A protein has these predicted regions:
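Fe(II)/2-oxoglutarate oxygenase catalytic core
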Residues: 1-181, 185-211
């Protein structure tokens, strides 16, 4: 899929359960995935222009048609993700949209509690173009065929005050090549893979913090 990629595993387990792999657990044991694992997947980072050229227009279209009208300035590297049997991603949001979060990911020693007042801390990192930016829109693109895996659905939590259903599993994107675009603050998870392997692309569009 890509001419250049940096690959590594991404498995984060809570201390209380670090002796048992997710594949060894029963469905009952993983029914509350946040109690056991934050994430269990393999990822690679892609920077191919032709992939951006396909995905970014879809994000801009969704930003307009959904009425979000976020000011977008740049994008992160594209994440290629592999979820194998037992793989999952617990409940999370892709980023908060405040000024502290815009800086703390990119500098050593910066925490959400530290006041920044718009000034850059002294230690820079390689991702200079991302400094001061926050994730505003997230996109997931399914690369697998529907019959190649079971489980592994993207699931949203719209909150207790949502007029409709609070939780929704996005089975609409199971057809290969389907995409879903959503605000990065929206809580979501990937349910455990039961059989097969799920491949996906994830892209985040960024802009200045909301005021």
């Amino acid at each position: 899929i890509s001419t250049t990629a940096l690959t590594h595993g991404n498995s984060q387990k809570k201390d209380k359960d670090n002796k048992k792999s997710i594949s060894e657990k029963t469905k009952e044991e993983v029914k509350n995935i946040q109690d056991y694992y934050i994430r269990d997947s393999e990822i690679a980072w892609l920077q191919d222009k032709w992939i951006y050229d396909i995905l970014q227009p879809l994000i801009r279209e969704a930003n307009d048609k959904a009425g979000w009208h976020y000011d977008l300035e740049t994008a992160e590297q594209i994440q290629f993700t592999v979820y194998k049997p037992g793989g999952l991603y617990g409940w999370h949001s892709d980023g908060q949209q405040d000024i502290a979060n815009a800086y703390r990911r990119y500098f050593e020693g910066i925490s959400i509690e530290k006041k920044i007042n718009g000034e850059l801390p002294p230690k820079f990192v390689k991702q200079n173009h991302l400094i001061g930016q926050v994730r505003k829109i997230s996109m997931t693109c399914n690369l697998s065929l529907p019959n190649e895996y079971t489980g592994g659905n993207l699931k949203f939590d719209f909150g207790p005050h949502h007029m409709g259903e609070r939780y929704h599993e996005v089975k609409e994107i199971r057809p290969q090549g389907s995409v879903v675009v959503f605000p990065s603050w929206l809580p979501h998870c990937v349910t455990p893979i039961e059989t097969g392997v799920r491949y996906s692309l994830v892209l985040w569009s960024l802009g200045r913090p909301l005021r």
